[in-house]
Amino acid sequence: AQEAAAHYGCSASASRLLGGEKPIHKKLENAIAAWKHTEDTVVLVGGHSTNVTIVGNFCGKGDLIIYDALAHNSIHEGTRLSDAESRPFPHNDTAALETILRSCRDKYAKVLIVAEGVYSMDGDIAPVPELVRIKKEYGCFLMIDEAHSACVLGRTGGGVDEYFGLAGDDIDMKMGTLSKGLGTCGGYLAG
């Protein structure tokens, strides 16, 4: 931290868009990608805005976003910003999710399933292995919001994939925040 402050100063003074890309940004993204066992990571200004941005822009017209009914407000906001159709499935009910997909998957070019790793209000853990099976069977993308599971679940705090023993690419997108277990600010999307 002292070395970074001496080299870059103690403030970015602005967002990356205004302040410019610095080598330390990519170093952070590479470190998160290695931790989350993904190809790459992008760091954004905050966890809430990361969900809104990704959920709101990953899918478009002719696509479907299907999300857990108890998902965080930022996920709901992202679905409202997207041109894709969206619909919730009952909380942690993978049978209901599969029923929905069976009835309509062929109507959409791309389908994004969104759930949280750990739900902040009640501590429920998502049935991630079953979500992975469903996304593979129906040709969907899977995004897990790890704001409350990264640094908490798993032997070393690696999150849901470590907790459930999943391969690094079983979850297409792992969203997380830097403001909880990592004690700073920002959000990331690893995939």
What is each residue range found by the language model?
Residues 3-24:
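A glycine-/small-polar-enriched, mobile loop at the entrance of the PLP active site in fold-type I
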Residues 14-21, 29-53:
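Short loop-beta-helix segment that forms the pyridoxal 5′-phosphate
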Residues 37, 61, 81-83, 138, ...:
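Short, structured coil segments at secondary-structure junctions
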Residues 54-73:
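Conserved PLP-anchoring active-site segment centered on the Schiff-base-forming lysine
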Residues 87, 91-144:
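Active-site phosphate-binding strand-loop segment of PLP-dependent enzymes
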Residues 121, 150-151:
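Catalytic P-loop NTPase motifs of RecA-like helicase/translocase cores
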Residues 162-191:
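Active-site PLP attachment segment
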